Every structure is written in structure tokens, then in C-alpha cells.
A protein has these predicted regions:
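Acidic, surface-exposed loops and disordered segments
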Residues: 1-175
Length: 175
């Protein structure tokens, strides 16, 4: 089996991270993989925001927690010290798919580099808020973008989870 197929089969969502920061060189490689994701008509509309500043990461975590309805103090990013936020231009008819493909590439690249990842939702709600719109504006990002997801990144704290058995009857063949 090829290395790529093996990585697809063995990548798992991590929900317990060490506090050690992922090196910038590794983050750059992961981001590059995201930038090479397929996109509708090759438009490459998704953008990626890297967040490693602890204060901002914690602020986003609190907002995400509130949106998710959890008790104050819960960290929906499971302690991950780094995150890559994927947004896509709403004017593209394939923007959700394009952003989702970026997320997949980010997670596979992280796994290849020995870095744990987890897709964290609620980016859509975050960036629909005044906070999110002002944050994008502060970065010089203009236009109508929708948050697709956060790719939480860090080193696995504990055992790497095994893949559960695959469900049956999910493929139908027409020959």
C-alpha cells in the first residue's frame, strides 16, 4: 500500500494535545499542503490563518466554547497550541467543498509529519460575528468569507487512537 493511502487509513482526530508548540517549519509544510488542495475550476479561493499567539488562541477558544454551548473553561481545541483557520470566499459556488479539501490536506500533512490534528467546527459562526468580521478586517482580509473549520494542531498527549472498524454496506457497485 502506498504511503499516502496508509496515512489516510491511520490518521485520527486527536483530542488531547501537549502544550509544546509545533515548529514554524512544520506549520509551513502543513500550510503548503493545504494550498495545494483541489478547488473548483482551480480558483484557489480558500484562505488560511495561522494562529500560534496564545492570547488570541485562547480568545478564539472561549468564543468557540460559547457558540458550542459548553461550560465556561472547556477548551474545544483540546489544548492544541496551534491552529489553522480555513475560510473560503462565499462568491464561489464550490466554496464549502474547496475549504473542506484544504482541511483534509492540512490534517493529512500534519499526520505525515507526526503532528496530531482535529477539525474543530463553529468557524462559520465565529466569522459571522462582529468579532470575526473585525478580526478579518484587522488582517486586511476583504470580501465575504465563510469560516470552514479550525485545524487544531499539536503533539499527541497519550496513545495515538486506533481506527474503528469500517461500517459495511457503504459502497455500491454498478458494472
Amino acid at each position: 500500500m502506498s504511503d499516502v493511502l496508509n496515512k489516510m487509513k491511520t490518521r485520527r482526530s486527536i483530542r488531547k494535545f501537549k502544550s509544546d508548540m509545533v515548529p514554524q517549519e512544520a506549520l509551513d509544510q502543513i500550510i503548503e499542503a493545504g494550498l495545494y488542495a483541489a478547488s473548483g475550476m482551480g480558483e484557489q479561493s480558500p484562505i488560511i490563518i495561522q494562529v500560534t499567539k496564545k492570547e488570541l488562541r485562547d480568545e478564539i477558544s472561549k468564543m468557540n466554547c460559547k457558540i458550542g454551548g459548553w461550560k465556561e473553561g472547556f477548551d474545544p481545541f483540546y489544548g492544541a497550541p496551534a491552529m489553522l483557520i480555513v475560510l473560503a470566499k462565499k462568491s464561489r459556488p464550490t466554496y464549502i467543498y474547496d475549504g473542506s479539501l484544504v482541511m483534509g490536506n492540512l490534517m493529512l500533512a500534519a499526520h505525515e509529519l507526526g503532528i496530531g490534528s482535529c477539525w474543530i467546527h463553529r468557524a462559520k459562526e465565529e466569522f459571522e460575528s462582529d468579532w470575526g468580521k473585525n478580526f478579518l478586517k484587522s488582517l486586511g482580509i476583504e470580501g465575504e468569507y465563510e469560516g470552514i473549520g479550525h485545524c487544531a494542531l499539536g503533539y499527541v498527549d497519550g496513545e495515538y487512537p486506533a481506527a474503528p472498524a469500517r461500517k459495511e454496506n457503504r459502497v455500491f457497485y454498478v458494472k
